[in-house]
Amino acid sequence: FDNRFHKFLKNVIMSEAQPIGKIIDYFYRVEFQQRGSPHTHCLFWVENAPKFGEVENDEIITFIDKYISCEIPDEKEDKELHDIVMAVHQHSKKHSKSCKKKGTVCRFNFPRPPSNRTFISEPSDPDKDSEDDEELAKEILSDLWEVIKKHEDENLDVSEIFKKIGLAQENFRTYYRFITNRNTVVLKRQPNEIYTNQYNPHLLRAWDANMDIQYILDAFSCVVYIISYISKAERELGLLLQQTKNEAEEGNLNAQQTMKKVGTSYLHHREISAQEAVFRVTGLRLRECSRKVEFIPVGENPCRMSVPLKDLEKQQSYKSSNRKRSN
């Protein structure tokens, strides 16, 4: 897996072909969910990518449509991609236990709504929108799902589905605001694609396995996402081992007994899959980013030690004060 992913990263994603644009930075974290096989969470920074809130939404939508799709390819025109999408990119209509982890019908929000075109839905404004507007929106969207379910075997397109409940695309966009509590990208999607996960055609053809590619609207959520995966599952274990070490010291155990106690605690509280065990034993990287940091031990104190942010701020404040005095 590690070899395949790195070749995919280097020879496809970072290649001159630029399947999702020119990548200027990246971060990834390998995860082993439920003691199973590895999968990778990645973030890519694309050169000159439009930023939400700084440009018109239409520019962002054009960017999204260029690189992201949830279309089921025509079997006659592109059988290879069609077969891959149908084999690895269809969410189960029965849903799995993982879907219901957070007490919802599907935490991945499948089925996804059909739409004639991609748009960015921004939450409704309580100061401008009434409760009656919200109730009407929820009623119409509920009717939409009923119609989709009733005619799922008839291969109708979005316009035909909308027509059956007297709904226009712009009205759908307006009503959709009432069921979202954050900025959301709604992709262009036909009724037969409501269980299709989004993908990039070039990446999917090369990787030949499930992916979930998204444009980031919320930078803060993105930062939280990065931090959570950098330290995922390791913080709790670290606290446990520290507690075990403290207990050993309080019991006046020698070094050998302390190591044995810590090792036993690790083995009894850390469940790992065979794949993760191999990753760790062989020294394969669980996370990596494009920005490399190398510590060079120079100066009077060559110890490698992180400096707290508050100390750095004090140093900066001290330097600023000295500059003012010298002026």
Regions found by a protein language model. Give the residues of each.
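Intrinsic low-complexity, intrinsically disordered terminal tails and linker regions enriched
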Residues: 1-40, 44-327
